[in-house]
Protein backbone atom coordinates (compact mmCIF):
# COMPACT_ATOMS: atom_id res chain seq x y z
CA UNK A 1 0.00 0.00 0.00
CA UNK A 2 3.04 2.29 -0.38
CA UNK A 3 1.76 3.45 -3.73
CA UNK A 4 -1.18 2.73 -5.99
CA UNK A 5 -0.86 1.38 -9.52
CA UNK A 6 1.23 3.61 -11.76
CA UNK A 7 2.88 5.50 -8.91
CA UNK A 8 6.66 5.89 -9.09
CA UNK A 9 8.36 7.24 -5.98
CA UNK A 10 11.24 8.65 -8.00
CA UNK A 11 9.03 10.90 -10.09
CA UNK A 12 8.24 13.65 -7.62
CA UNK A 13 10.75 16.49 -8.16
CA UNK A 14 10.23 20.14 -7.23
CA UNK A 15 7.56 19.58 -4.61
CA UNK A 16 6.10 22.75 -3.15
CA UNK A 17 7.33 23.44 0.37
CA UNK A 18 4.94 22.46 3.19
CA UNK A 19 4.63 26.08 4.33
CA UNK A 20 3.48 27.13 0.88
CA UNK A 21 1.01 24.25 0.80
CA UNK A 22 -0.43 25.43 4.11
CA UNK A 23 -0.84 28.97 2.79
CA UNK A 24 -2.53 27.75 -0.38
CA UNK A 25 -4.91 25.49 1.49
CA UNK A 26 -5.88 28.38 3.74
CA UNK A 27 -6.44 30.69 0.80
CA UNK A 28 -8.40 28.19 -1.22
CA UNK A 29 -10.71 26.89 1.46
CA UNK A 30 -12.06 30.15 2.81
CA UNK A 31 -13.94 32.87 1.00
CA UNK A 32 -12.58 35.56 3.31
CA UNK A 33 -8.92 35.27 2.32
CA UNK A 34 -8.29 39.01 2.13
CA UNK A 35 -5.09 38.91 4.19
CA UNK A 36 -3.54 35.83 2.61
CA UNK A 37 -0.17 36.52 0.92
CA UNK A 38 0.01 36.26 -2.86
CA UNK A 39 0.41 32.69 -4.03
CA UNK A 40 3.35 31.89 -6.31
CA UNK A 41 2.78 31.01 -9.92
CA UNK A 42 4.60 27.82 -10.81
CA UNK A 43 6.28 27.09 -14.11
CA UNK A 44 4.38 25.88 -17.15
CA UNK A 45 3.46 22.15 -17.04
CA UNK A 46 4.91 19.84 -19.64
CA UNK A 47 1.40 19.20 -20.97
CA UNK A 48 0.71 22.90 -21.53
CA UNK A 49 1.46 22.66 -25.22
CA UNK A 50 -1.67 20.55 -25.59
CA UNK A 51 -3.86 23.36 -24.27
CA UNK A 52 -5.76 25.40 -26.87
CA UNK A 53 -4.30 28.88 -27.20
CA UNK A 54 -6.28 31.62 -25.39
CA UNK A 55 -7.22 34.89 -27.01
CA UNK A 56 -8.97 33.49 -30.06
CA UNK A 57 -11.52 35.70 -31.79
CA UNK A 58 -15.19 35.22 -30.85
CA UNK A 59 -16.81 32.39 -32.73
CA UNK A 60 -20.31 31.38 -33.65
CA UNK A 61 -20.83 29.23 -30.57
CA UNK A 62 -23.05 30.00 -27.58
CA UNK A 63 -22.83 33.00 -25.28
CA UNK A 64 -21.29 31.29 -22.29
CA UNK A 65 -21.01 32.09 -18.57
CA UNK A 66 -18.93 29.90 -16.23
CA UNK A 67 -19.75 29.97 -12.52
CA UNK A 68 -18.19 28.07 -9.66
CA UNK A 69 -15.45 27.47 -7.13
CA UNK A 70 -11.78 26.47 -7.33
CA UNK A 71 -12.55 23.12 -8.96
CA UNK A 72 -13.56 25.21 -11.99
CA UNK A 73 -11.17 28.12 -11.46
CA UNK A 74 -8.05 25.87 -11.49
CA UNK A 75 -5.90 27.90 -9.07
CA UNK A 76 -2.19 28.18 -9.90
CA UNK A 77 -2.60 26.53 -13.29
CA UNK A 78 -0.80 28.88 -15.73
CA UNK A 79 -1.73 31.50 -16.62
CA UNK A 80 -3.60 33.19 -13.79
CA UNK A 81 -6.33 35.64 -14.79
CA UNK A 82 -7.84 38.78 -13.28
CA UNK A 83 -9.01 39.28 -10.63
CA UNK A 84 -5.94 37.62 -9.12
CA UNK A 85 -7.69 37.22 -5.77
CA UNK A 86 -9.88 34.53 -7.32
CA UNK A 87 -6.86 32.37 -8.24
CA UNK A 88 -8.41 31.66 -11.62
CA UNK A 89 -6.64 30.21 -14.65
CA UNK A 90 -7.00 31.10 -18.30
CA UNK A 91 -6.68 27.36 -18.88
CA UNK A 92 -9.32 26.09 -16.46
CA UNK A 93 -12.02 23.85 -17.90
CA UNK A 94 -14.35 26.81 -18.63
CA UNK A 95 -11.71 28.47 -20.84
CA UNK A 96 -10.93 25.21 -22.59
CA UNK A 97 -14.64 24.66 -23.21
CA UNK A 98 -15.15 28.21 -24.49
CA UNK A 99 -12.30 27.90 -26.98
CA UNK A 100 -13.32 24.43 -28.13
CA UNK A 101 -16.88 25.63 -28.76
CA UNK A 102 -15.85 28.91 -30.35
CA UNK A 103 -18.03 30.78 -27.87
CA UNK A 104 -19.56 33.98 -29.21
CA UNK A 105 -18.95 35.52 -25.79
CA UNK A 106 -17.42 34.16 -22.61
CA UNK A 107 -17.57 35.35 -19.00
CA UNK A 108 -15.54 33.28 -16.54
CA UNK A 109 -16.63 34.46 -13.10
CA UNK A 110 -15.43 31.38 -11.21
CA UNK A 111 -13.57 32.15 -8.01
CA UNK A 112 -11.61 29.97 -5.61
CA UNK A 113 -13.29 29.62 -2.24
CA UNK A 114 -16.76 30.37 -3.60
CA UNK A 115 -19.82 29.09 -1.82
CA UNK A 116 -23.35 29.13 -3.18
CA UNK A 117 -24.07 32.50 -1.56
CA UNK A 118 -21.13 33.97 -3.49
CA UNK A 119 -22.70 32.81 -6.71
CA UNK A 120 -26.13 34.16 -5.86
CA UNK A 121 -26.04 37.25 -3.67
CA UNK A 122 -22.81 37.93 -1.79
CA UNK A 123 -19.84 39.99 -2.96
CA UNK A 124 -17.13 37.41 -2.26
CA UNK A 125 -14.11 38.71 -0.33
CA UNK A 126 -10.72 37.83 -1.81
CA UNK A 127 -7.19 38.89 -0.95
CA UNK A 128 -7.37 41.63 -3.60
CA UNK A 129 -10.87 42.85 -2.83
CA UNK A 130 -14.46 41.72 -3.14
CA UNK A 131 -15.87 40.39 -6.41
CA UNK A 132 -19.54 40.73 -7.40
CA UNK A 133 -21.99 37.84 -7.08
CA UNK A 134 -21.35 35.53 -10.00
CA UNK A 135 -25.00 35.53 -11.01
CA UNK A 136 -24.56 39.15 -12.10
CA UNK A 137 -22.79 37.88 -15.23
CA UNK A 138 -25.86 35.94 -16.41
CA UNK A 139 -28.25 37.82 -18.68
CA UNK A 140 -31.29 37.06 -20.80
CA UNK A 141 -28.92 36.63 -23.76
CA UNK A 142 -26.83 33.94 -22.06
CA UNK A 143 -27.11 30.61 -23.88
CA UNK A 144 -24.90 28.30 -21.80
CA UNK A 145 -24.07 28.26 -18.08
CA UNK A 146 -21.78 25.78 -16.34
CA UNK A 147 -21.69 25.59 -12.55
CA UNK A 148 -19.36 23.77 -10.18
CA UNK A 149 -20.32 24.41 -6.57
CA UNK A 150 -20.96 22.59 -3.31
CA UNK A 151 -17.55 21.51 -2.06
CA UNK A 152 -16.97 24.65 -0.02
CA UNK A 153 -20.58 24.70 1.18
CA UNK A 154 -19.98 21.44 3.02
CA UNK A 155 -16.35 22.30 3.91
CA UNK A 156 -15.07 19.15 2.23
CA UNK A 157 -11.74 20.64 1.02
CA UNK A 158 -10.98 22.14 4.42
CA UNK A 159 -11.75 18.91 6.26
CA UNK A 160 -9.67 16.85 3.82
CA UNK A 161 -6.74 19.23 4.26
CA UNK A 162 -6.77 18.82 8.03
CA UNK A 163 -6.74 15.03 7.82
CA UNK A 164 -3.23 14.49 6.53
CA UNK A 165 -1.42 11.81 8.53
CA UNK A 166 2.31 11.17 8.94
CA UNK A 167 1.74 7.77 10.53
CA UNK A 168 -0.87 5.04 10.33
CA UNK A 169 -0.62 4.83 14.11
CA UNK A 170 -2.67 8.04 14.22
CA UNK A 171 -6.39 7.24 14.15
CA UNK A 172 -8.22 8.21 10.95
CA UNK A 173 -9.96 11.55 11.22
CA UNK A 174 -13.10 10.41 9.41
CA UNK A 175 -14.32 8.78 12.62
CA UNK A 176 -14.56 12.24 14.18
CA UNK A 177 -17.01 13.32 11.48
CA UNK A 178 -19.71 10.91 12.62
CA UNK A 179 -21.31 12.22 15.81
CA UNK A 180 -24.04 10.24 17.56
CA UNK A 181 -24.46 8.18 14.43
CA UNK A 182 -24.89 11.24 12.20
CA UNK A 183 -22.36 11.83 9.42
CA UNK A 184 -21.66 15.56 9.49
CA UNK A 185 -20.74 15.84 5.81
CA UNK A 186 -23.75 13.84 4.66
CA UNK A 187 -25.96 16.03 6.80
CA UNK A 188 -24.42 19.18 5.31
CA UNK A 189 -24.95 17.89 1.77
CA UNK A 190 -28.64 17.36 2.42
CA UNK A 191 -28.95 20.70 4.19
CA UNK A 192 -27.40 22.59 1.27
CA UNK A 193 -29.29 20.84 -1.52
CA UNK A 194 -32.13 23.37 -1.38
CA UNK A 195 -29.62 26.18 -1.89
CA UNK A 196 -28.27 24.47 -5.01
CA UNK A 197 -31.81 24.08 -6.31
CA UNK A 198 -32.41 27.76 -5.61
CA UNK A 199 -29.26 28.68 -7.52
CA UNK A 200 -30.48 26.78 -10.57
CA UNK A 201 -33.85 28.51 -10.34
CA UNK A 202 -32.14 31.91 -10.14
CA UNK A 203 -30.07 31.16 -13.24
CA UNK A 204 -33.14 30.01 -15.15
CA UNK A 205 -35.02 33.14 -14.11
CA UNK A 206 -32.29 35.39 -15.52
CA UNK A 207 -31.63 33.29 -18.62
CA UNK A 208 -34.78 31.28 -19.40
CA UNK A 209 -33.43 29.90 -22.68
CA UNK A 210 -29.97 28.99 -21.43
CA UNK A 211 -28.65 25.47 -21.25
CA UNK A 212 -27.53 24.94 -17.64
CA UNK A 213 -25.01 22.23 -16.78
CA UNK A 214 -23.92 21.39 -13.24
CA UNK A 215 -20.37 20.04 -13.50
CA UNK A 216 -19.40 17.59 -10.79
CA UNK A 217 -16.23 16.95 -8.84
CA UNK A 218 -13.82 14.25 -9.93
CA UNK A 219 -12.19 11.09 -8.64
CA UNK A 220 -9.71 12.56 -6.17
CA UNK A 221 -8.28 9.42 -4.62
CA UNK A 222 -8.52 5.66 -5.16
CA UNK A 223 -10.26 3.66 -2.39
CA UNK A 224 -7.08 2.33 -0.78
CA UNK A 225 -5.20 5.63 -1.03
CA UNK A 226 -1.42 5.49 -1.47
CA UNK A 227 0.07 6.15 1.96
CA UNK A 228 2.79 7.32 2.54
CA UNK A 229 3.19 8.80 -0.96
CA UNK A 230 0.11 10.87 -0.10
CA UNK A 231 -0.36 11.38 3.66
CA UNK A 232 -3.89 10.04 3.86
CA UNK A 233 -4.92 7.08 5.99
CA UNK A 234 -6.49 4.43 3.70
CA UNK A 235 -9.66 4.60 5.79
CA UNK A 236 -9.86 8.36 5.27
CA UNK A 237 -9.09 8.01 1.55
CA UNK A 238 -12.07 5.73 1.05
CA UNK A 239 -14.26 7.94 3.25
CA UNK A 240 -13.52 11.22 1.50
CA UNK A 241 -13.99 9.89 -2.02
CA UNK A 242 -17.28 8.43 -0.82
CA UNK A 243 -18.27 11.92 0.35
CA UNK A 244 -17.26 13.41 -3.02
CA UNK A 245 -19.40 10.76 -4.69
CA UNK A 246 -22.27 11.58 -2.35
CA UNK A 247 -21.96 15.27 -3.21
CA UNK A 248 -21.89 14.54 -6.93
CA UNK A 249 -24.89 12.23 -6.68
CA UNK A 250 -26.87 14.89 -4.81
CA UNK A 251 -25.96 17.54 -7.37
CA UNK A 252 -27.06 15.15 -10.10
CA UNK A 253 -30.38 14.72 -8.35
CA UNK A 254 -30.77 18.49 -8.01
CA UNK A 255 -30.13 18.86 -11.73
CA UNK A 256 -32.73 16.22 -12.58
CA UNK A 257 -35.27 17.76 -10.22
CA UNK A 258 -34.79 21.26 -11.68
CA UNK A 259 -34.78 20.15 -15.30
CA UNK A 260 -31.14 20.93 -16.07
CA UNK A 261 -28.11 18.75 -16.81
CA UNK A 262 -25.34 17.18 -14.74
CA UNK A 263 -21.92 16.37 -16.20
CA UNK A 264 -20.10 13.70 -14.21
CA UNK A 265 -16.32 14.11 -14.28
CA UNK A 266 -15.57 11.07 -12.14
CA UNK A 267 -15.31 8.48 -14.93
CA UNK A 268 -12.78 10.47 -16.95
CA UNK A 269 -10.58 11.07 -13.88
CA UNK A 270 -10.36 7.44 -12.73
CA UNK A 271 -6.69 6.48 -12.76
CA UNK A 272 -5.70 10.15 -12.82
CA UNK A 273 -6.16 10.84 -9.11
CA UNK A 274 -3.64 12.13 -6.56
CA UNK A 275 -2.01 8.68 -6.41
CA UNK A 276 -1.25 8.50 -10.12
CA UNK A 277 2.23 9.06 -11.53
CA UNK A 278 2.90 12.82 -11.91
CA UNK A 279 2.56 12.73 -15.69
CA UNK A 280 -0.81 10.95 -15.41
CA UNK A 281 -2.44 13.11 -12.76
CA UNK A 282 -5.47 15.26 -13.37
CA UNK A 283 -5.69 16.20 -9.69
CA UNK A 284 -2.68 17.13 -7.58
CA UNK A 285 -1.95 15.81 -4.11
CA UNK A 286 -0.96 17.55 -0.90
CA UNK A 287 2.39 18.62 -2.40
CA UNK A 288 1.75 19.30 -6.10
CA UNK A 289 4.33 18.19 -8.62
CA UNK A 290 2.57 19.94 -11.51
CA UNK A 291 1.48 23.61 -11.45
CA UNK A 292 -1.76 23.60 -9.46
CA UNK A 293 -3.01 24.08 -5.94
CA UNK A 294 -3.01 21.15 -3.51
CA UNK A 295 -5.96 18.78 -3.98
CA UNK A 296 -7.08 20.61 -7.13
CA UNK A 297 -7.12 19.97 -10.88
CA UNK A 298 -3.93 20.65 -12.82
CA UNK A 299 -3.66 21.75 -16.45
CA UNK A 300 -4.08 18.24 -17.80
CA UNK A 301 -7.19 17.74 -15.67
CA UNK A 302 -8.73 21.02 -16.78
CA UNK A 303 -7.97 20.17 -20.40
CA UNK A 304 -9.57 16.74 -20.05
CA UNK A 305 -12.75 18.09 -18.45
CA UNK A 306 -13.04 21.03 -20.84
CA UNK A 307 -12.55 18.82 -23.88
CA UNK A 308 -15.04 16.21 -22.67
CA UNK A 309 -17.54 18.94 -21.88
CA UNK A 310 -17.12 20.42 -25.36
CA UNK A 311 -17.87 17.04 -26.90
CA UNK A 312 -20.88 16.66 -24.60
CA UNK A 313 -22.25 20.11 -25.43
CA UNK A 314 -21.70 19.64 -29.16
CA UNK A 315 -23.48 16.29 -29.06
CA UNK A 316 -26.48 17.89 -27.40
CA UNK A 317 -26.01 16.08 -24.08
Predicted feature residues:
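Sec-dependent bacterial lipoprotein signal peptides
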Residues: 1-30
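C-terminal region of N-terminal signal peptides and the immediate post-cleavage residues
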Residues: 17, 28-52, 56-57, 317
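Charged, often glycine-rich, active-site loop that binds/positions anionic groups
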Residues: 113-132, 275-289
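Serine-esterase "nucleophile elbow" of acetyl-processing enzymes
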Residues: 46-113, 164-170
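Catalytic His-Asp segment of secreted/periplasmic serine-dependent ester chemistry enzymes
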Residues: 218-317
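Conserved N-terminal glycine/acidic-rich loop preference
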Residues: 144-147, 168-204, 213-262
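Structural recognition of the beta-strand scaffold that forms the well-ordered cores
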Residues: 63-68, 72, 105-110, 143-148, ...
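Oxyanion-hole/transition-state-stabilizing segment in secreted/luminal serine hydrolases
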Residues: 77, 128-187
Amino acid sequence: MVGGPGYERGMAPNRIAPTVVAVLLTALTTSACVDAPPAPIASEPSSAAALPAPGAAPGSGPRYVAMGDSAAAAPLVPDQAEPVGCLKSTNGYPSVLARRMGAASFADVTCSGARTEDLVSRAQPTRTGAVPPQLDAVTAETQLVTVTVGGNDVDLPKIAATCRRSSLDTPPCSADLVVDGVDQISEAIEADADDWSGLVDDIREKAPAARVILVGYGTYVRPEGCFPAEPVNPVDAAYFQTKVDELDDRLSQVAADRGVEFFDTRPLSVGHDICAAPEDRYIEGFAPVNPAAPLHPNGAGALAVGTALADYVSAGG
